[in-house]
Amino acid sequence: MATPHINAEMGDFADVVLMPGDPLRAKYIAETFLENAREVNNVRGMLGFTGTYKGRKISVMGHGMGIPSCSIYAKELITEFGVKKIIRVGSCGAVREDVKLRDVVIGMGACTDSKVNRMRFKDHDYAAIADFDMVRNAVDAAKARDVSVRVGNIFSADLFYTPDPQMFDVMEKYGILGVEMEAAGIYGVAAEFGAKALAICTVSDHIRTGAQTTSEERQNTFNEMIEIALESVLLGDNE
């Protein structure tokens, strides 16, 4: 049944949902990659769609910015609409010199300065990691398309405008591939409620050099990342 944030019914969503932060990107994905896509949510402008990709039912829905927002939608999709897998498809900023604009990053683990997973885990550190099979399928899907991907830790930040830029030095030292704002929260929600999750990000800007893509490019042209996510779902069905 509908929730305060999602005006859909059981069965409206597929068991796998791709989740970009931007609801307009969700609309773009549905219109570009899915067949027979129909709108299944529009509460607060957080658009959601369900259609098919190569005959496979798949949904896509925005999750907003930051862990509090994405956690609401991820939790409700899992507990109220039967979603089993969530794939975050979004952007991240690079801090390492060897990570370039438009590189595709697969978040095997997600560090964070947020306390949400400590709140879930009795104030202990929780290792927020992606589902291994989903990681493997994404890597295999990328290889099949001859797309090079980076696999490793990302960092989910609570603040977009950080007051502590020296933290980027620490991230670089520890090999963080990209900085975003949601993956650790989605991984925590998935673990708490028995689902699986993965974050795939395209590098939209470089925090060190200032290089960046345009907002229009971030909405419309990260097609390789979306194709990897969709093809990984099909590989998962064949396991």
Curated annotation (Swiss-Prot):
Positions annotated as active site in the UniProt record: 205 (proton donor)
One of the GO biological process terms: purine nucleoside catabolic process
Protein residues bound to phosphate: 21, 25, 44, 88-91
Cited SUPFAM superfamilies: Purine and uridine phosphorylases
Enzyme Commission designation: 2.4.2.1
Residues annotated for a purine D-ribonucleoside binding in this entry: 5, 180-182, 204-205
Reactions the enzyme catalyzes: a purine D-ribonucleoside + phosphate = a purine nucleobase + alpha-D-ribose 1-phosphate; a purine 2'-deoxy-D-ribonucleoside + phosphate = a purine nucleobase + 2-deoxy-alpha-D-ribose 1-phosphate
Pfam family, one: PNP_UDP_1
GO cellular component: cytosol
One example GO MF annotation: purine-nucleoside phosphorylase activity
Positions bearing the site annotation: Important for catalytic activity: 218
Domain of life assignment: Bacteria
Keyword list, A-Z: Glycosyltransferase, Transferase
Regions annotated as coiled coil: none
Entry similarity comment: Belongs to the PNP/UDP phosphorylase family.
Biological function: Catalyzes the reversible phosphorolytic breakdown of the N-glycosidic bond in the beta-(deoxy)ribonucleoside molecules, with the formation of the corresponding free purine bases and pentose-1-phosphate.
Quaternary context: Homohexamer; trimer of homodimers.
PANTHER family: PURINE NUCLEOSIDE PHOSPHORYLASE DEOD-TYPE, URIDINE PHOSPHORYLASE
Protein name (database record): Purine nucleoside phosphorylase DeoD-type
Lineage: Bacteria, Pseudomonadati, Pseudomonadota, Gammaproteobacteria, Enterobacterales
